[in-house]
Amino acid sequence: MKTTGAFCVLLFISSLVGVPNPLDDSTADQTKLIALENAWNQAQLHHDDRALDGLIPDTFVYTDYDGTVMNKAQFLADLKDPSYRATMIANQNVKVYPYQNVAIVVGNYHTKGTYKRKPFEHFGRFTDTWIYRDSKWQCVASHTNLIKKGAEF
């Protein structure tokens, strides 16, 4: 039984040898992913659902800080909501954790604006899961949560 298990592990590892890894040039890919995160922020600032449409697949899942879960269509519709007017969205302490054809991007965000004419200011953290397929990066899942003002940011 141990021999069969060891063989299966060896077979799996050897199957990965020929798989190209887009993160071989880690610095370039990390820079690209951070640029995509910044493009995402700009799309949100300008209610640009077309810009985000190419960054997220049809299977996209978003979990908002209040626990709301949205699919791609819901997320893009929410993005166009004219009652939400962000005046600033900034990421800080962004880190990219590369894996085979996948990268996890985490960081802090600070956003200001108005929602239904009431001012807001949020400090939070985000986790985005990106996959590399069809020669491009797409974010398949995103999660945000709020942190208290003054918490480690």
Where do the protein language model's features map onto the residues?
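Hydrophobic h-region of N-terminal signal peptides that target proteins for export
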Residues: 10-18
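A beta-strand edge to alpha-helix "cap/lid" segment located at domain peripheries
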Residues: 21-153
